[in-house]
A protein has these predicted regions:
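Localized edge beta-strand/strand-to-loop motifs within extracellular or lumenal beta-rich domains
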Residues: 1-6, 68
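A general structural signal for short secondary-structure junctions and capping/turn motifs
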Residues: 36-37, 53-57, 89-97, 104, ...
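Glycine-centered positions in the ABC transporter ATPase nucleotide-binding domain
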Residues: 11-12
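Extracellular structured ligand-interaction cores
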Residues: 2-4, 43, 55-62, 98-100
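Extended recognition patches within non-cytosolic domains
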Residues: 16-27, 59-126, 130-146
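Extracellular beta-rich ligand/substrate-recognition surface
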Residues: 19, 51, 167-168
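Short carbohydrate-recognition loop motifs
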Residues: 158-168
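Extracellular glycan-interaction patches encoded by glycine-rich segments
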Residues: 30-60
Length: 168
């Protein structure tokens, strides 16, 4: 059945793009799985494979994981009326669940997960993430909710017509 796991990226359901088929009913997934043996715990990884050192090279903003509920994309974002581009909004989530989290990546400090690091969970659950392979200089303040045009004063030979807050 195709309704047991939903994955959305920018309001697009990418669940059908997943390989390996759909999970059986009541299957225990690696994501969000807990073990009673502390030496065999599964860890949530964002941008890294579960085994080895396969890391992604990407920009990421507003990562939400809701445990136990299936919510619509409209709980997390909306389409901009002017540009037609999907943009994040404050999450409309009544309960994140025990293992749920919301990462806004507001802080630039790296290392062990805490409320003042890049992996701070702002859902209220305090499920902070430890960063690995990330430097303070990798953090950028140019995000979908904080975007500003930057002009290059050294490139005086170009002509431009600026509009929409100099973002176009």
């Amino acid at each position: 059945d195709t309704n047991r796991l939903k994955v959305y990226i920018n309001n697009t359901d990418v669940s059908a793009d997943m390989t390996g088929g759909w999970p059986a009913e009541d299957v225990i997934h690696q994501l969000n799985q807990e073990f009673s043996d502390s030496s065999n715990q599964n860890t949530h990884n964002i941008g890294k494979g579960t085994r080895g050192s396969n890391y992604s090279d990407m920009y990421i903003a507003d990562f939400a994981f809701v445990d136990g509920l299936q919510l619509a994309p409209s709980n997390f974002g909306e389409t901009d009326e002017d540009s037609g581009i999907w943009k994040p909004k404050a999450p409309d989530v009544s309960a994140w669940g025990d293992n749920g989290f919301f990462l806004e990546f507001k802080n630039s400090a790296v290392g062990t997960g805490a409320s003042d690091t890049i992996g701070a969970d702002t859902s209220g659950n305090d499920n902070h993430f430890t960063s690995s392979g990330v430097a303070v200089t990798d953090h950028t303040t140019d995000t979908p909710t904080n975007s500003f045009a930057t002009m290059n004063p050294l490139d005086a030979g170009a002509e431009a017509t600026l509009s929409e807050g100099n973002l176009k």
